[in-house]
């Protein structure tokens, strides 16, 4: 019975993904195209290929191009135009592969920098490693022609270099550059909801150290709208925590201690069970922040007793 329920849940989840995300829709189209191809229904397969091609190029979902290519290439009509059509498709394939390679390079580099930041954040850095990243060719500013995903990863990587140097303002500006890429390209948001929500949450965190709260209400609103549409509960809870945390800092900066206490009590009520279950260090931090809020409101001894 449990297995049956699990399978039904998985099917419902897959249907939801197909109906509600661009990537889910594209995956479904390509799966249907593969089925039609395998059964020799070439005309129907070509219709699906056309639909998939439109989504791939409209939303820069080049990860899916390889599958499209191997469906499309065998279906090129064997007539007098075959050679030209085959050459055009091969040229396109090489161009997309080149873009995917660029994205992969930025992805790998951004992961290396993130790990470097996490490993050395509380210790002494190896100067050679840090200089290697700072001088890396991929982190020079001539990136205008690369795909949006690579541009996003470019700024993501630089953010952690500036965080490592404790240059909070530059880290804020790099995260702001990431957000601009999304806000200028609505379709990029639709195809990359996870990255968009992460970026908005990170913007709230980046505000804290340079104390740049001028865009707080704007970012908070954008994040709340995005969270209503997104179904990853763990991510949504984490980003709601970022909203509470930024509101708490903003309230303390404005000497609005009662508001700060209210924000932290709301956060505690919302996140206590989740943090106890998944992230005890975040739970301890939250209790500490709650204690500070009580202290500022002259309620510390009463609440801690």
What are the language-model segments listed below?
Residues 60-67, 101-108, 145-153, 186-200, ...:
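Alpha-solenoid helical repeat architecture
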Residues 252-305:
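Helix-coil-helix junctions within alpha-helical repeat/solenoid scaffolds
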Residues 105-230:
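Internal metal/ion-chelating core segments
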Residues 42-43, 62, 82, 168-169, ...:
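TPR-repeat structural position
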Residues 1-133, 143-145:
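Flexible inter-repeat linkers and adjacent short helices
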Residues 29-38, 70-79, 108-124, 152-167, ...:
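Tandem amphipathic alpha-helical repeat scaffolds
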Residues 49-57, 90-98, 133-143, 175-188, ...:
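Amphipathic alpha-helical segments of tetratricopeptide repeats
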Residues 198, 202-206, 210-232, 236-268:
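Acidic, glycine-rich loop-and-beta core segments that form the ion-binding/anion-interacting portion
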